[in-house]
Regions:
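Conserved anion-binding
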Residues: 80, 92-166, 174, 179, ...
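N-terminal amphipathic alpha-helix/helix-capping segment at the start of soluble metabolic enzymes
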Residues: 1-23, 128-142, 195-196, 202-203, ...
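Alpha-helix-loop-beta-strand connector modules within alpha/beta enzyme cores
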Residues: 53-79, 83-87, 109-117, 138-142, ...
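Conserved N-terminal beta1-alpha1 strand-loop-helix module at the mouth
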Residues: 1-70, 74-77, 109, 146, ...
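Extended, intrinsically disordered, low-complexity segments
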Residues: 233-237, 241-265
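Hydrophobic faces of well-ordered beta-strands that scaffold small-molecule active sites
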Residues: 16-22, 42-44, 70-73, 93-95, ...
Length: 265
């Protein structure tokens, strides 16, 4: 039987997929985000967030039970990290700094069971996908989503080759992209690189995705042609909401809250 992957259904229907970014290991926050109307996916951030592999299972199940797809971002393309993320029941995987087609091929290999890959067998805790054991294995190679992050000039240079690989989503990390390129965030060179990635995805029939911190940013990216966009993070929403209420109450702001979560450049 097919795995229950709402985000894949959304993508196949050609509908824009808005999602949230989870950096805190809280099932309550995960449930709140995932149960919000029109949220298609929630990224469990195991790279920069305060989340580690011991949190993956509970977070994935809470998100899936709320009707959204849990995706797990691992810190690197290590085979064991990918295996642990997928064995938690994640509907898809995100790997940062996929800076070459060679790295992407290794990611795909680690994600898929033999004969198409090298993933070890042990789907005992994949409840969030709706299947376990052999039923899970029979559909996992086809149904699980593979997202690689494009956030380095080397990846931009190789983007046409990267999107030829057996991935589903090319996900732009715009902050790391600007830093690694040594250019202004939102400047001409930065936006040109983003447009190049978007065009390559469209030509290859792959999902074009990008990280955004605000709904306004996300709306512009959807209008630009992106298929999948984050609208904000949990920590940004918490920080900005509290800071706004505090400023309204006191008439004062401070440097820390004015800076938001610290993610922005």
């Amino acid at each position: 039987m097919p795995l229950n992957i709402p985000l894949r259904k959304k993508i196949l229907a050609g509908e824009p997929a808005a999602g949230g970014w989870l950096t805190l290991p809280s099932t309550a926050i995960a449930r709140t985000i995932a149960s919000t109307k029109n949220v298609s996916w929630v990224l469990i951030d195991g790279e920069h967030g305060l989340i580690n592999e011991s949190h993956f299972y509970d977070l994935a199940n809470v998100i899936a039970a709320s009707g959204a797809s849990p995706l797990v971002r691992v810190p690197a393309e290590e085979v064991w990290l990918i295996k642990r993320a997928l064995d938690s029941g994640a509907h898809g995987l995100m790997v940062p700094m996929a800076n070459s087609a060679e790295i992407v091929r290794k990611v795909v290999q680690a994600t898929k069971y033999p004969p198409h890959g090298i993933r070890g067998y042990g789907p005992m805790f994949t409840h969030a996908t709706g299947q376990l054991g052999g039923s899970y294995k029979d559909s996992a190679n086809e149904d699980l989503l593979i997202a690689v992050q494009i956030e380095h000039p080397n990846a931009v240079k190789e983007i046409e080759d990267i999107v030829k690989e057996d991935i589903d989503i090319a996900f732009i990390g715009p902050f790391d992209l600007a830093v690694s390129m040594g250019v202004e965030f939102g400047g001409v060179e930065h936006e040109a690189a983003i447009s190049k990635i978007l065009d390559a995805c469209k030509k290859a029939g792959k999902v074009a995705a990008i990280f955004c911190l605000t709904g306004e940013q996300a709306a512009k990216r959807f209008a630009q042609g992106f298929d999948m966009v984050s609208v904000t993070t949990d920590i940004d929403t918490l920080t900005d909401g509290f800071a706004a209420a505090l400023q309204a109450a006191t008439g004062q702001s401070n440097a820390f809250t004015a800076a938001g979560s610290g993610y922005s450049l």
